[in-house]
Every structure is written in structure tokens, then in C-alpha cells.
Amino acid sequence: MSGQGPQRRLLGSLNATSPTTPHFKLAANQTGPRCLEVSIPDGLFLSLGLVSVVENVLVVAAIAKNRNLHSPMYYFIGCLAVSDLLVSVTNVLETAVMLLVEAGALAAQAAVVQQLDDIIDVLICGSMVSSLCFLGAIAVDRYLSIFYALRYHSIVTLPRAWRAISAIWVASVLSSTLFIAYYNHTAVLLCLVSFFVAMLVLMAVLYVHMLARARQHARGIARLRKRQHSVHQGFGLKGAATLTILLGIFFLCWGPFFLHLSLMVLCPQHPICGCVFQNFNLFLTLIICNSIIDPFIYAFRSQELRKTLQEVVLCSW
């Protein structure tokens, strides 16, 4: 992808460009401001991608192996792992092909590289959209399990969960295809940015409401035990910290990428916005980091899944 559109790393590798360096540097031109550009070494990018691949493959394998994990909640978590897996695999594949082309180990015409790049971009964008969707689906599922506990199993059934999962994947493929085909259209970029904001607001509202309900429940228990202050204060701090970490990681890892898209609409030619565009690979790296962190937030906290994961790692099928 390019600086002012989806970055085309493969196509750009056909041109004479300087290699990336593993340090911060200030970029400047004759008319623009000095910019802080963070260069991401390809080795680091590939390493992070491979770590994410291993983690998410283990999550999917554990859920597939243990029948006790064959429930809507874990299916959503498994689909999130698949989405994060695709994010990592496609980015690793794109970087690997780019390095092979630059090294002359892979001879390809520009048209062939462009077609391959378009396919990879569709996969990257689709996996990003599906990842955001499943983060929202997990939030909705947890909300229903708390506020509609008695009716949860009649509301969130396996057929409904599979229909929701299918709809998310179909919508992700269609939207990513349109985005790559019409990435230079303002309306498409605005839709993608609006989608991110909607997911952020949805998750914030649901998790804040869940935190409020949990604190209310803790106060009720504290009154029964006649030690309201200590229990309420301790739970409030723990709950607030968990919520801050969950939403903070989501915003920090995904926010810069969508800031990049927003600036493409608001100020595509402004020198200061150009400084942001120069760090697009950093924003992709943050998304890869999110794919590494997601299993720790949503999957590895489950004792049942951790136990199954140990069996998978030890190959005790």
C-alpha cells in the first residue's frame, strides 16, 4: 500500500528504494516539516507475524480438539483467532515475497506482482474487518451472558452463532474487495473509519455497562458480608484496570491505522499528514501486535482452554 492509499509494498519493491533500518529517523524535504519516521526492520515484522501465527494456530487447535469448547462463545473466540491468523499470515507472506523480489530470487513481471499484491491486500483488509467484527461479537456475547443469564442459551444458540459467523465472513470479504478496488474514493474510506469508530463505541458501551453491573453485584455481596468498602473498592480498581487494558489495547493497536485512513480523507496533501503516512508500516506492526495480545485477553484466561492447549503442545491427542 502506498503512503496515501493502501500501501503497495510488493509493487514498491520493484522500484529502487532504500532498505528499511531498525531505528528512528527524521525525514525532511525542502518544503515540508521534519518528520519522525519509525522504520520497522523486516526481520522484526516477520518475527512478530510468526509469533502471532503460532499463538492463534494453537488457540484454533485447542478449540477444535476439546468438545467442551464447542459453544458459541468459544466459536467466536476461535473465529477471532482465525482472523488474527489471517492478518499475520498475509502480512508475513507479503513481506516475504517483497524480500524475494528485492533480492532477485523471485523474478516476476510488474503486472503479476500487482495482481498478487491486490489479492494479498484483499486478504489483509478482509481479515482486519473480520477481526474487528469478532471483537464486537465477543463483547455482545459476554453482555448477553451477564444481562440475560437465564435466557442466554435460548438467545445465543449454535445455529444463530453460525449464521452470525457466516454473515461476518461474507461481509468481510465483500467489504475488503470493495475497499481495495475503490480505496481512492472518499466514501469508502469514511465507511471503513466509521466502522472502526462504531466498533470502538459498541465495545466501550457494553463493557462499561458490564463493569457497572458487576460492581453493583459486588456491592450487594459486600452488604451481606458487612464489609462493603474494602470489597467494593478492590473490585472497582480491578474492574477498571481490566476495562482500561482491554479498550486501551484495542485503541492503541487499531487507532493509528484508522487515523491514517482518516487523514487520507482530511488532508491527503498536507505535509504534516504526510509525516503520518510515512509510518504506515508501524501501524501494520501494531495490528500484528494486537493479534499477539488477543489470545491472552480472550482465550488463554480460560482454564479449560489452557489445559487443552497443554495437551496440544505436548501432542497428546
From Swiss-Prot:
Keywords: Cell membrane, G-protein coupled receptor, Glycoprotein, Lipoprotein, Membrane, Palmitate, Receptor, Transducer, Transmembrane, Transmembrane helix
Keyword Metal-binding: no
Lipidation sites (S-palmitoyl cysteine): C315
Any Pfam family the entry gives: 7tm_1
PROSITE patterns (alphabetical): G_PROTEIN_RECEP_F1_1, G_PROTEIN_RECEP_F1_2
Subunit composition and interactions: Interacts with MGRN1, but does not undergo MGRN1-mediated ubiquitination; this interaction competes with GNAS-binding and thus inhibits agonist-induced cAMP production. Interacts with OPN3; the interaction results in a decrease in MC1R-mediated cAMP signaling and ultimately a decrease in melanin production in melanocytes.
Name under which the protein is recorded: Melanocyte-stimulating hormone receptor
Gene source species: Vulpes lagopus
Gene name for this UniProt entry: MC1R
